[in-house]
Amino acid sequence: AECDITCTSSNAVQVVEAVAKEWNADTVILVPDQYLAKNVAAMTDIRIMTWPGACEVHELFSADDVDQLREAHPGVVILAHPECPPDVLEVADYAGSPAALANYVKERTPAKVVLLTECSMSDNVAAENPGVDFVRPCNLCPHMKRITLENIYDCLVNGEHEVLIPEDVRLRAKAALDAMMALPKMEKPLDFEVGR
């Protein structure tokens, strides 16, 4: 709620460039994920200031992991989430948001693939693509695993697990979301540049 606009990994470059253009700025602060910010910076001329925060799932992947996966699984296609460190994207075959990774698998149907992202994402894409062999070097997100159907049910029916947000914070957060939603809709999720 302390930002002017929010973004997703699908539209981060679009948001950075739109903000810079609208405010005639050559520098944008992109937080909290330093790796998404660094990977966005590689795709734009806008100077990006970042913060040393990271997703605890994606920051665990390394370029060495990619090398080991290629050695253990010859011919495997490596797809990386843009919140992975830049050196991972440099050795991956493709990088993009979760939607872009899912589209890649659906459209190109590689024989064998690795998704360098949270395990549940790989599970969902695998379920939609039964003809593709998924290698799963899983990193689990403990926070996402707390969101269960039972907890959602309890929240909706019984009012349990409710998170109360002060109205002033809600309004600022809504303004940041509204600013993002006002941007033109992208036709497809963004592909991130990779080194391969």
Where are the predicted features?
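The feature marks the mature, well-folded catalytic cores of soluble enzymes
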Residues: 1-196
